[in-house]
Amino acid sequence: MDELVAQVNHEDLPRSVRGNAGWIEVIAGSMFSGKSEELIRRLRRARIARQKVQVFKPELDSRFSDNEIVSHSEMRHDSSNSRSAEEILAKVDPDTEVVGIDEGQFFDNQLVTVANELARRGVRVIIAGLDQDYTGKPWEPMPQLLAIAEYITKTHAICMKCGQPANYSQRTFESEERVAVGASDKYEARCRSCFVPHADAPTVHE
């Protein structure tokens, strides 16, 4: 019970309580599960608390905006594009208190080192991303980030076939590329029963 209370209230802890130590929060789940929306909600709360916030996203994700993170529900927050995790570290100002990172799965494994370093400096690090690729395999560096995070939030979507809680991102077009940026035009949320690994477009809609 104490652990559950800590997870619910961690974002409201004043810096005087946690001293100089930062922490890492990971928001993970399938597409359309509200990851970016939850990230933006936490960032807005930090700004209301007058904390300095910086937000980053991978350069390759320009689906909705070049200089904002945007949820599927149209929530928005200003962000800076980064080509690599090391570039994020270089861009973080010394007085920044909260760092938000969206689409963590698109960064390399160096993101783990960067997140740890920022937390060591006393920064609250919030990372949102897909924990599985379109085949259902763990998507690095998200598993490693989940292992080192103090706080983890697992989000779920609604299966587009049966309406049950969805944990998978079903690709609805033919491609074997692991990274294929898209939205509802290319992917559907699926539950365990309805998810078809390696499915191509004709199979998906049977």
PLM-predicted stretches and their roles:
Residues 103-118, 132-139, 203:
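Conserved ATPase-coupling elements of RecA-like P-loop NTPase cores
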Residues 97, 149-150:
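Conserved acidic residues
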Residues 100, 123-131:
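Structural recognition of the conserved hydrophobic beta-strand(s) that form the central parallel beta-sheet
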Residues 151-162:
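Conserved AAA+ ATPase "SRH/arginine-finger" region at the nucleotide-binding site
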Residues 52, 124, 151:
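Residues at the starts of beta-strands that form the adenosine-phosphate
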Residues 42, 113-121, 141-148:
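Catalytic-core regions built around general acid/base machinery
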Residues 94-98, 104:
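Short acidic/histidine-rich motifs immediately flanking catalytic phosphotransfer sites
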Residues 2-94, 133-144, 157, 172-173, ...:
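Conserved P-loop
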